[in-house]
Amino acid sequence: MAEAVRRDWQVTVFNRGVHGRVPDGVHRLRGDRTAPDGLAALTGGEWDLVVDTWDGAPRAVRDAALALADAVPHYVYVSSGSVYAPPVAPGSGEEAPTVPADADGDDGDYPANKAGGELAATRVFGDRALLARAGLILGPGEDIGRLPWWLNRVARGGDVLAPGPRDLPIQYVDVRDLATWLLDRGAEGVGGAYNVVGRTGHATMGDLLDAAVAVTGSDATLRWTAPEPILAAGVEPWNDLPVWIPRGHEYRWLQERDVERAYAAGLVCRPVTETVADTWRWLREVGRVPDRAGRPARAPVGLAPEREAALLAALPA
């Protein structure tokens, strides 16, 4: 929404209207897409483009797409790389098999919900549906808290458990670069599935954490540690140490997807230093990672201080 407003587009949002506010000039339609007649507010409207981020029951995407079938020429569905069926080989592209899903399905697990949402959007809009399989999303406004956790931890200073190797490539997309690509390609009428995330190695764990030290002005010392002792201590990649997935891990493919199709379609990713600096600026403005409005709470990410201290104490001097 912020990128569309920045472009001076006429923007309409559809939601229940019980959380947050919308920028001046944005028209809000109220409704509950899971309720009977909950899409009534869409009746009679016409738009140039729809962007749907729904991650619940696929039938809600189906119903919204059907309600908008004659009101909009193009449907953008923000999906996820989680739709791919395990095991996923590193380097896989959009042709990789997806998890079993049903366009008419009720709320299930996240991969099936997103895969079902893709089926629903495609059933109604065909090749006029753009399926953006986003990867790890970082940047200002991140309400999961992965990069904010690292920034807050580094800002506290002292020895920081830095999961290695330092040159481990990471794969993510800045939310603003994702938004730009979605609106550009949506306006052009592009359809089909795309892995929308930066190239593996656009940045490394070292680049990310060095940038965190720089922007916070912290006296933190990054204690780079090989994966083996970290994993042996029961630390979970991705959750306990956000962003980090070491080589050889079953979910390493999340950091090694083929994204050349999205790049050929104009994806441009800003430097990691900009993403980190702008996220820190936003985090200082809001004070803490905001609650996920209208969505189930997620388990907190990041190691507890006492657990990190114990791990650091066990490392060789």
Would you name each region that the model predicts?
Residues 1-53:
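N-terminal Rossmann/SDR dinucleotide-binding element
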Residues 45-101, 105, 115-120:
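NAD(P)-cofactor binding segment of oxidoreductase domains
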Residues 117-141:
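Conserved beta-loop-beta element that borders a ligand/cofactor-binding pocket
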Residues 110-114:
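Active-site YXXXK catalytic motif of short-chain dehydrogenase/reductase
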Residues 83, 137, 201:
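Conserved sequence/active-site signature of Rossmann-fold short-chain dehydrogenase/reductase
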